[in-house]
Amino acid sequence: MSGVSDNINGFLNEITEIDQKITNAKTNIVKIQEFQGQILNSTSTTQENFTTKEREALVSDTRNLLVECKDRIKRIQYDNVRIHSSDPNFGIRQQRYDVLRTKLSNVLEEYRQAESDFMKQTKVRMARQYKVVNPNATQQEIDDYLSNSDSQPIFQQALLRTNEAKSALAEVQKRHEDIKNIESTIAELAALFQELHLQVESQDQTVINIEQNAEATAQKT
């Protein structure tokens, strides 16, 4: 009995640690959004570059936190699979797992939405600078540049024009790199979300199979 008690106490401690890390990730996301607002509203290149570096560092830390939480929830899931539903701790283990999985899913979705909004705003800002370089540019030309930045000869011509155009060109190219980085983060978040939910589906079927096999064995004896 004491072994079961020790086991559930260790499990509850693990749950508390993971829950706190998810909360930390959520706090980071709020700060990342603050950085993004500062970047979009910045009028100083020096300050913007500094804030961008701070944001990138926090994005990296948050990525590591989210991956760690996903991995630790996965381990709990696999442990739960090995416990029969008649175990006295099965209910609380499954309930706590479900709560953590839902909390992490919500944080992943919240973060994905924040990055998606930031990408849209960055594209709007980039489009304004693009039109400084090429005042007659259409939205299609801007979209084409986003898809393939190497295919725009207009920028080679822009280098021969005003200092304003040169500055705008540098701005456009920087925004394009920012957008690619944001897209990468969004893809990572989508992959984490999908993996988390694929694991749940797999686990649910595994539990069903285990219980069906146990019942079949009992009926034969």
Sequence positions of predicted segments:
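Juxtamembrane amphipathic/hinge helix adjacent to a transmembrane helix
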Residues: 204-221
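Regulatory linker/N-terminal fringe of the SNARE motif in t-SNAREs
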Residues: 1-19, 23, 27, 33-198
